[in-house]
């Protein structure tokens, strides 16, 4: 994929992929093809162009399902990115199930996108936001987990891979321990899906947000809805 980055037509070392990644030529070509040949709404028309777009959209959903090994394509919800996906969970699950006195646990490694929505939700609901710290090695301090993971914790938010440190967190262990007390787990997989094979069924996470950019996924364009979520 790196050789297909259009921006590499000049000497450049780009190390800010944690913030945003460059688009390879196949993505740009597919987007251009869409706008030039079959620009239309998805699931909003019965004419030819709309049918083409709808079929492509649903094929993209099936591709994502297979890629992250979700149990059903119905588990895949397209959003504009991991940030929107996390906010979607906060404003749906969070508003419906988080109550006064409940606790939400995140880690010290989280991107602001997996902190601020929970801060705002806790302010609205009178809930408590707790933070699992990391140690001098840049690893989560699991020795504090038993203290922080109380029966009041209703949701745990954890990054699969830190966007700053690159630490690969033991998310499967965290998910198992959270589930034992009845908490739901949201995994921010934005920095993991490009480098680690993802199997959401094996992880047993409740919600997962990811940003996907891979050649195999370009067979069908993601129209209007840009990124994938909800195993994103």
Task: For the regions a language model picked out, list residue spans one by one.
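Pyridoxal 5′-phosphate
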Residues: 1-4, 8-224, 232
């Amino acid at each position: 994929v790196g050789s297909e980055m259009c921006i590499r037509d000049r000497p450049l070392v780009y190390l800010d992929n944690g913030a945003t990644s460059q688009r390879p030529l196949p993505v740009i070509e597919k987007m251009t093809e869409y706008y030039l040949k079959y620009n239309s709404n998805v699931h909003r028309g019965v004419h030819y162009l709309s049918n083409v777009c709808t079929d492509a959209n649903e094929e993209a959903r099936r591709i994502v399902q297979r890629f992250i090994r979700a149990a059903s394509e119905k588990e895949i919800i397209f959003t504009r990115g991991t940030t929107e996906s996390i906010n979607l969970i906060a404003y749906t699950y969070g508003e419906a199930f988080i109550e006064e006195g409940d606790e939400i646990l995140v880690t010290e490694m989280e991107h602001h996108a997996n902190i601020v929505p929970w801060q705002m939700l806790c302010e609205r609901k009178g809930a408590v936001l707790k933070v699992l710290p990391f140690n001098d090695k840049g690893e989560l301090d699991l020795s504090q987990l038993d203290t922080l993971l109380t029966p009041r914790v209703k949701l745990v938010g954890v990054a699969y891979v830190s966007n700053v440190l690159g630490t690969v967190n033991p998310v499967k262990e965290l998910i198992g321990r959270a589930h034992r007390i009845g908490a739901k787990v949201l995994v921010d997989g934005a920095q993991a899906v490009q480098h680690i094979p993802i199997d959401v069924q094996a992880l047993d996470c409740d919600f997962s947000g990811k940003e996907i950019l891979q050649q195999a996924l370009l067979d069908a364009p993601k129209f209007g809805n840009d990124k994938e979520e909800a195993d994103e």
